């Protein structure tokens, strides 16, 4: 896919922390229950740590028990891209930032109403902007 923000690996390595680079650019996953934003309950907006695109609102964040920040929907349609992920012997749907292609996490069909979806997102993929 072509993304609005398109940088070389060298540039991403300069701009991101090693953990952010591993997750956002190499499709890594942080350990459950360790992310800085996992327990965050402040009101505000969650943006892509790589490009600053607005992705999720605290209004749709909920405690899923998964160990990662979980949301039942993005702030609006089109801010995340979905693609099939068959890694690690599993069939999942990967979530990417639609502006820079950064790996955010995965979406599952076991979330609460009104969507029934659980966007399971790595804390390192996000930055929080408090209201």
UniProtKB/Swiss-Prot annotation:
Source domain of life: Bacteria
Gene name linked to the record: msrB
Species the sequence originates in: Leptospira interrogans serogroup Icterohaemorrhagiae serovar Lai (strain 56601)
Listed HAMAP family: MsrB
A single Gene Ontology CC term: cytoplasm
Enzyme class: oxidoreductase
Keywords carried by this UniProt record: Metal-binding, Oxidoreductase, Zinc
Enzyme Commission number(s) from the entry: 1.8.4.12
Protein name: Peptide methionine sulfoxide reductase MsrB
Cofactor: Zn(2+)
């Amino acid at each position: 896919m072509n993304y609005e923000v398109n940088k070389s690996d060298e540039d991403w390595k300069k701009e991101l922390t090693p953990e952010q680079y591993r997750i956002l650019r190499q499709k890594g996953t942080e350990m459950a229950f360790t992310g800085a934003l996992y327990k965050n309950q402040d009101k505000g907006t969650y943006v892509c740590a790589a490009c600053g695109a607005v992705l999720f609102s605290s209004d749709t964040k909920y405690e899923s028990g998964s160990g990662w920040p979980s949301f039942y929907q993005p702030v609006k349609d089109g801010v995340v891209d979905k693609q099939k992920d068959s890694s690690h012997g599993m069939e999942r749907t990967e979530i990417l930032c639609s502006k820079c292609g950064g790996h955010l996490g995965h979406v599952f069909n076991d979330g609460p109403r009104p969507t029934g979806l659980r966007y399971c997102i790595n804390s390192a993929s996000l930055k929080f902007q408090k209201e």
